[in-house]
Regions:
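Short catalytic/metal-binding and nucleic-acid-binding patches
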Residues: 1-231
Length: 231
């Protein structure tokens, strides 16, 4: 109990089932907030990519397996009908869970998560990612509010989830002040962003860009521009 972890989960067949748009961001943020509160898991960083998810969390009560099962199940139940599909939403393997043993491990993985869209050649800065992405400035700040998506969840009834869920991004334990940790995250993130830009320039390539990311088909593994983001 009390360990910190990098948690990752891929969509089935690497399909872009979590392609970023307002509905997907609202849904995942809401369910993450609900799950974190229910299982008392502390969230430090999150990035929802088109075909996978990364979280950095601390698990004070050793409830991480229940947390991931609950979150993954609700995301699948909501997104599948939204996409007009009924097959498995997630890849058959379970979530990848990597224990973070030192403060340096935690800092490195938080920066890794936030730099994911940049390292993948999608956007030049992590903050430009149109999906759910936790900014360093949100660490230790006011909770982020997500309204319950009315397009899937019941508004009334004994089993109804809360109308508003609040996600609080907290500083990992043992890493000093909030301000110091934010600065360290920003510095590490910027270093990755600079390296990614240099690598693309060397390869004579460009970042894909938000418009093309959102125009990808949810069901393609490659870059297949078909329609605008409507899910």
């Amino acid at each position: 109990p009390g360990g910190s972890y990098l948690v990752s989960r891929r969509c089935t067949q690497r399909q872009f089932l979590l392609r970023p748009c307002q509905d997907t961001t609202q849904l995942f943020g809401y369910l993450l907030a609900v799950a974190a509160e229910r299982f008392h898991v502390d969230v430090h960083a999150v990035c929802v990519m088109s075909n996978h998810v990364h979280l950095v969390v601390t698990d004070p009560e050793a409830r991480l397996p229940a947390f991931t099962r609950y979150l993954d199940s609700l995301v699948a139940r909501a997104m599948n009908p939204r996409l007009g599909r009924s097959e498995s939403f997630w890849a058959p393997s379970r979530s990848s869970v990597v224990a973070l043993q030192t403060p340096a491990d935690i800092l490195g993985k938080v920066a890794y998560v936030l730099a994911n869209p940049v390292a993948a050649g999608l956007v030049r800065r992590g903050r430009l990612w149109p999906g759910l992405w936790s900014a360093p400035a949100q660490l230790g700040a006011a909770a982020i509010e997500f309204k319950r998506p009315g397009w899937f969840f019941r508004k009334k009834g004994k089993t109804a989830l809360p109308g508003v869920a609040r996600l609080r991004l907290v500083t990992p334990p043992g890493l000093g002040s909030v301000e110091d940790f934010r600065r360290e995250v920003v510095s590490a993130l910027q270093a990755i962003e600079r390296q990614a830009a240099a690598d693309l320039a060397t390869a004579h390539r460009e970042f894909l860009g938000v418009r093309r990311v959102q125009a990808q088909s949810p069901f393609g593994e490659g870059i297949r521009i078909r329609s605008g983001c409507s899910t």
